[in-house]
Design a protein with these regions (language model features):
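Iron-sulfur cluster-binding electron-transfer modules in prokaryotic oxidoreductases
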Residues: 1-199
Length: 199
């Protein structure tokens, strides 16, 4: 039978960890940030390329408050050269504001004009300071909002878009930043194995 399940979704992590055992499930559930941090600790992944810029980390409700996983995502970010981890003072970890996706809220149109995801996005943007890298969100020195939950990613991406900040702020999973630093996805270097056509 299945012994371990690896999940990128804190909602799935919570359900599989805390509810499935009531129905006889017996397996270990690992969130991808815990798993990837283990690979970094074992030197199987070595973040070496600088990923410059400020990174504001958003705590997912189901990863943090429900399952007390706060440090793994932060330790990954701190292991990446060039990253300046920014905390939203007074609104992080156990006091972090929800992204607004919980309880299927991401599928509802709120009656008032103040959507929770926009409020949270503005908190994160304020913590990053004035984004001055216009037109360079995917380059060096970019400001980044990072999370470790696909639901949060969707809500925060919508929040960034609602403020027309897509050019100034990128929204990435913590592990996407780790992959960048490890060179995952970089184009292969050119080789001289094939002869160039004669001129």
């Amino acid at each position: 039978g299945i012994k371990k399940i690896l999940t990128t979704c804190p909602h799935c992590f919570n359900t599989l960890t805390n509810e499935y055992p009531d129905f006889g499930a017996k397996f270990e559930v690992i969130h991808h940030t815990d798993y990837m941090l283990g690979l970094v600790a074992e030197k199987k992944l070595v973040p070496s390329k600088p990923v410059k810029g400020k990174v504001a980390y958003h705590d997912s409700c189901y990863l943090g408050r429900y399952n007390d996983i706060y440090e793994s995502p932060r330790q990954i970010l701190q292991a990446i050269p060039g990253v300046e981890l920014i905390e939203v003072e007074g609104w992080n970890k156990k006091k972090g504001l929800c992204c607004g996706a919980g309880g299927a809220q991401m599928f509802m149109e709120e009656q008032n004009k103040d959507r929770v995801n926009v409020k949270r996005t503005l908190q994160l943007v304020d913590a990053l300071g004035n984004p001055t890298n216009k037109g360079n969100a995917h380059g060096h020195g970019a400001h980044t909002i990072a999370s470790a939950c696909p639901f949060c990613m969707t809500m925060l991406k919508d929040g960034v878009k609602s403020q027309s900040l897509e050019e100034e702020i990128q929204n990435l999973d913590v592990v996407e930043l780790l992959a960048q630093s490890c060179g995952v996805g970089d184009p292969a270097p050119a080789t001289n194995d094939s002869a160039s056509p004669a001129a």
